[in-house]
């Protein structure tokens, strides 16, 4: 019988790990999926700003942290006392890679003595912001199986509207000028250009990130109201590319030369409808003008099958365990 890997997740009480947070994908991975895997023995340490590593010396094989910094990540202790003398590998989940411009990533790597980084982002995107010497693994996760197991049938949903949800840019001139001059990497148009463009169409229904009751674990319930939905991010795919297909939506998916969405395993017109800034209106019109064509349901079902298999949290944990082994 193989010996279980002992993993200690050290964290602070924080909004990001709350059940009430508007994003619960990371919470479900770290607090649920890891716990139910038989190959690891999880130890959860809820701490204050300072944690003494000697308390777990000889009791764990891996230290796991919510992120690589505590500047904006309020789940991470300010100090791991004694970490400089510890031989326990430290693995961290990353946040948004572009946030790395807000702090010294090498300084934080030394502060927490980080050995490995993981996240859902493509490795090439990670290394746009982090040193090539940092060890990183792309690990797909985000779909908590129980939340997507039983979804409303495709034909029972709203068909004549396409759902668009999440952050968008403000198109007013003074907002655009301000964003270009002062927001830099945080300019919404850098991330959500096509998503913003879609809102001008009469058959697109838009909901903001927080402008509805379906936040956190309830997000799939919003998606299940619609037969079709838009997953569009300009520079890098997000978990909407996992969640919308998993919810059974026919997903209009932005796939361009820069956002790495082509690496997610979907096939155009088979498991998703690929769109870009040039063809999105045409693709929408093809759907809206032929709502009852059975091919839309077939594509939605194929997308759901792929998403449930590829992006579920249990598979994510299996990949994470293989990453742990590289440091043992």
Feature locations, PLM:
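C-terminal "capping" alpha-helix adjacent to the active site of nucleotide-linked donor transferases
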Residues: 276-295
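Alpha-helical elements of Rossmann-like donor-binding domains used by nucleotide-donor carbohydrate transfer enzymes
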Residues: 29, 78, 193, 282-286, ...
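Short, Lys/Arg-enriched, disordered terminal segments
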Residues: 1-5, 324-328
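Active-site/pore-lining binding-face segments in mid-to-C-terminal subdomains
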Residues: 241, 246-249, 275-276, 296-300
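A short acidic/histidine/glycine-rich donor-binding loop in glycosyltransferase catalytic cores
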Residues: 268-275
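A charged, aromatic-enriched C-terminal amphipathic alpha-helix characteristic of glycosyltransferases
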Residues: 291-325
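Nucleotide-sugar donor-binding catalytic core of glycosyltransferases
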Residues: 3-60, 65-82, 89-243, 250-264, ...
